[in-house]
Regions:
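Mid-sequence helix-capping/hinge segment at a functional interface
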Residues: 1-42, 46
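Short, glycine/serine-rich, charged loops/turns that create anion-binding
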Residues: 37-38, 71, 134-135
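Donor-binding and catalytic core of enzymes assembling or modifying cell-surface/extracellular glycoconjugates
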Residues: 45-132
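A short acidic, often aromatic-flanked loop/helix-cap motif at beta-alpha or helix-coil junctions
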Residues: 10-12, 96-99, 153-158
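Nucleotide-sugar donor-binding patch of glycosyltransferase catalytic domains
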Residues: 90, 118-183
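Short, basic/glycine-rich phosphate-binding loops at helix/coil junctions
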Residues: 1-2, 30-33, 78, 152-158
Length: 183
């Protein structure tokens, strides 16, 4: 029988090194946050992410690693320059090979539908993935590590390319499912 659950392995020594380098502590909630995506219709607003991170940090002492590439630096800077920025570390200047052990040292990921969500899932993180303009039935249901959010009025089956639902992702649903993820 074929197991569709992907699994990515990371060297334990590399994970231990990044835990020391980035002061990743077990008593904190450590998240990978991926606020970017391949296009603007697949991105939940950066201000929503800022508000979400603030709320999560009120509930649990948290550290947020903001994943993205060079093209995402302005987006990430908005988060770093916000009131929650002191709890955030940008990964935009790192290669995927450098980011993977950092991801493996974390427990949770909250992402738009992007490659970082799938890497986090493969590393065994509990993931909340926001699908707003792509089909979660194709890209999100393969993994037990992925919890899915779709726009209000859509379902896992109906959400797809051209849904253009980024403004219909409900903040309360994302917050509630984020809190459920860590419990």
């Amino acid at each position: 029988e074929l197991n569709p659950q992907s699994k990515i392995y990371c060297n334990k020594n590399e994970i231990d090194e990044v835990k020391i380098k980035f002061n990743i502590k077990a008593e904190e909630k450590n998240y990978i946050i991926a606020p970017s995506a391949s296009g603007p219709t697949k991105r939940w607003g950066v201000n929503n992410y800022i508000k979400l991170l603030e709320e999560l940090n009120k509930t649990y002492s948290s550290k947020f690693f903001i994943a993205g590439g060079k093209d995402d630096e302005t987006l990430i800077k908005n988060i770093i320059d916000s009131s929650i920025g002191k709890n955030c570390i940008s990964l935009s200047n790192k290669s995927v090979a450098e980011i993977i052990p950092i991801m493996a040292a974390c427990n949770y990921a909250i992402c738009n539908d992007t490659g970082f969500a799938h890497l986090a899932s493969g590393l065994g993180l509990k993931c909340l993935v926001l699908f707003m303009d792509s089909p979660p039935i194709a890209y999100g249901t393969y993994s037990k590590n992925i919890s899915i959010i779709v726009p209000e009025g859509e379902s896992i089956e109906s959400c797809g390319h051209n849904t253009k639902g980024k403004d219909k992702i409900l903040f309360k649903e994302v917050l509630d499912k984020s809190l459920k993820l860590v419990n």
